[in-house]
Amino acid sequence: LMLSFLTLIGCSRSTPPEIDLTQIDQALQRTSNTTAPAPHSDIEAAAFERFTHFYNEYSADRIASNVRNLYAKDAFFADPYHLVQGIDSIEDYFIAMAAPAQSCTFEIGKIQRAENDFYCRWTMHLISNAAPDQPIIAQGLTHMRLNPAGKIIFHQDYWDTSVLLDRLPVVGFWTKLVKNRILKGMNHE
């Protein structure tokens, strides 16, 4: 969930890489025939519990001790800034993203099922080491797929990246300016 926000706080890269949407489409295609746990089964309930617990307190220690219980070996993860394939890469990415956070918690909403796809809304509360007096709250949506054992095989996060861009000294000025101009234009129609 909104892990890439932490990238902007702690890493020197100033612009996000271009996301290759074909990789996301391929991951969706690859996982489309995987049967998820039965609805309302113990396996499904345990998967939801692991997901909620994992993101409830997002820290390097919790990631290291729980990520392999939550994600399958060949899992795919995507957010607006990164695409990551395989449990080792996912673990490395998650730990790197947690490093610049003083604290990071996610409130996970009810997980909804549509056939073999699962969706949930979430709210992230982040306090970064770089700006501990400026807590950040962001909302997003997760789309995921589970294998029969209840492990995540596909995870894609959707969220408004301007929440974090607004916090960057130069970029923030421009994103706020653009948003204000869009709002003014909408109010004049």
What residues fall within each predicted segment?
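Bacterial N-terminal signal peptides
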Residues: L1-L8
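Short, low-complexity N-terminal intrinsically disordered segments enriched in polar/charged residues
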Residues: C11-S65, N69, H188-E189
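Low-complexity, intrinsically disordered terminal/linker segments enriched in charged
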Residues: E18-T31, Q156-E189
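A solvent-exposed, acidic/Ser-Thr-rich amphipathic alpha-helical stretch
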Residues: A64-N116
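A short, polar/proline- and glycine-enriched secondary-structure boundary/capping micro-motif
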Residues: D88, A130-D133, V163-V170
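Short, surface-exposed coil-to-beta transition loops
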Residues: S103-F106, I136-T142
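A short, structured loop/turn motif at beta-sheet edges
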Residues: I111-F118, R145-I153
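A short hydrophobic beta-strand element
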Residues: N116-L126
